[in-house]
Amino acid sequence: MEHSTFLSGLVLATLLSQVSPFKIPVEELEDRVFVKCNTSVTWVEGTVGTLLTNNTRLDLGKRILDPRGIYRCNGTDIYKDKESAVQVHYRMCQNCVELDPATLAGIIVTDVIATLLLALGVFCFAGHETGRLSGAADTQALLRNDQVYQPLRDRDDAQYSRLGGNWARNK
């Protein structure tokens, strides 16, 4: 039990040391973003802004251009030996679609309706022909008794049976 109390105290002390002692305000005026400090603003990483009014205010530019970065300020009065940081991250998505439950339900219902209409179209296009028997009924034995060829008959009633009448026939 003593070890867990010591360990939880150590974790708490580590987390509290990471907390900023004072807040750094991020302001939005019209369409621009500003970081404001009582003392000077220091850029750490991200969007490099323009310093304004005695280095206490940093203009990050238009919010539509997605300003982001980490900025530091030195403290004043009781926090004059402390330093605090703020992370700014704007994401102004102009081509995004807000996916709320109503939009999601609409997409799902539309998908189901389109699938059913497609299935109905395939069913109607590839519909069954009436009056036609199955393929097994179409096949019949043309020759019986395993004959390969059907013998020709002697008939002289057709127009083409007289064409080679003078030639001898092999029977």
UniProtKB/Swiss-Prot annotation:
What Gene Ontology cellular-component terms does the record carry?
alpha-beta T cell receptor complex; external side of plasma membrane
The GO molecular function terms of this record are:
transmembrane signaling receptor activity
Q: Does the keyword Cell membrane apply?
A: yes
The residue ranges crossing the membrane are 106-126
Pinpoint the ITAM domain residues: 138-166
Q: Which residues carry this modification: Phosphotyrosine?
A: Y149, Y160
Report the subcellular localization. Answer: Cell membrane
Q: Which domain of life is it from?
A: Eukaryota
Q: Name one GO biological process term.
A: adaptive immune response
- Disulphide-bridged cysteine pairs: C37-C73
Leader peptide range in chain numbering: 1-21
Enumerate the Extracellular topological stretches: 22-105
CDD domains in the cross-refs: IgC1_CD3_gamma_delta
Bilayer topology reads: Single-pass type I membrane protein
* Organ and tissue specificity: CD3D is mostly present on T-lymphocytes with its TCR-CD3 partners. Present also in fetal NK-cells.
Q: What is its main location?
A: membrane
Positions of glycan attachment: N38, N54, N74
Q: Which UniProt keywords apply?
A: Adaptive immunity, Cell membrane, Disulfide bond, Glycoprotein, Immunity, Membrane, Phosphoprotein, Receptor, Signal, Transmembrane, Transmembrane helix
Which Pfam family is an annotated match for this chain, by its short name?
ITAM
Its quaternary organisation is:
The TCR-CD3 complex is composed of a CD3D/CD3E and a CD3G/CD3E heterodimers that preferentially associate with TCRalpha and TCRbeta, respectively, to form TCRalpha/CD3E/CD3G and TCRbeta/CD3G/CD3E trimers. In turn, the hexamer interacts with CD3Z homodimer to form the TCR-CD3 complex. Alternatively, TCRalpha and TCRbeta can be replaced by TCRgamma and TCRdelta. Interacts with coreceptors CD4 and CD8.
The identity of this protein, by name, is T-cell surface glycoprotein CD3 delta chain
Organismal lineage: Eukaryota, Metazoa, Chordata, Craniata, Vertebrata
Its gene name is CD3D
